[in-house]
Design a protein with these regions (language model features):
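Juxtamembrane membrane-water interface segments of multi-pass membrane proteins
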Residues: 1-7, 22-26, 42-64, 77-94, ...
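Hydrophobic membrane-spanning alpha-helices of multi-pass integral membrane proteins
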Residues: 11-18, 66-74, 99-102, 128-142
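Small-residue-rich transmembrane alpha-helices that serve as helix-helix interface/gating elements
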Residues: 32-38, 97-99, 152-169
């Protein structure tokens, strides 16, 4: 019960922070950053993905996707905190949240959701990791190396698109 209450408190902080950000972008970004980091910590602590990481096959793939997504969620929170303190990092925050966290969640849940919704049978194999690896490698290239070299940022962005196409195939 305490876990659920804490989770609800974090969600309320996140929704409140999002509302404040919409009203006062420059001032209230840290009200969004802190709940993002808290959510990443909560998920990383209580999600079953920590245990299924040591399984085999599809459960392990899903755990890798989820845990990588939680790491990007923490990065997004840290980046938004930096933005609140006046550091440049909006691009990092948006891409860590949008591509790193959200797309990782989509990739991790798709093998269960798509067959249920579309009535398609997906055969899991090691190739499932290719789009995931491409996504995270290209995102690192885009937001870490790309800070110092704009050409590499552009290449990272193009490789992000390739990763999404690989996933769609």
């Amino acid at each position: 019960i305490i876990r659920i209450v804490k989770f609800c408190e974090i969600i309320i902080m996140f929704v409140g922070g999002a509302g404040l950000v919409l009203a006062w972008l420059g001032f209230a970004v840290h009200f969004l950053a802190i709940p993002l980091m808290m959510l990443a910590l909560w998920f990383g602590t209580f999600d079953i993905a920590r245990r299924t990481l040591f399984a085999k096959g599809l459960p392990r793939y899903m755990a890798v996707c989820l845990l990588a997504g939680y790491a990007w969620l923490a990065v997004a929170g840290l980046a938004w905190m930096g933005v609140a303190l006046g550091c440049p990092g909006r691009d990092l925050a948006l891409h860590a949240l949008g591509l790193g966290f959200i797309v990782s969640m989509v990739m991790g849940h798709a093998p269960v959701i798509l067959p249920a919704v579309l009535r398609l049978k997906l055969l899991f194999g090691p190739w499932f990791y290719a789009p995931l690896l491409a996504l995270h490698a290209s995102l690192l290239l885009r937001v870490v190396v790309g800070v110092w070299e704009p050409a590499l940022r552009a290449i990272g962005a193009q490789l992000n698109a390739v990763a999404l196409l690989l996933f769609a195939i």
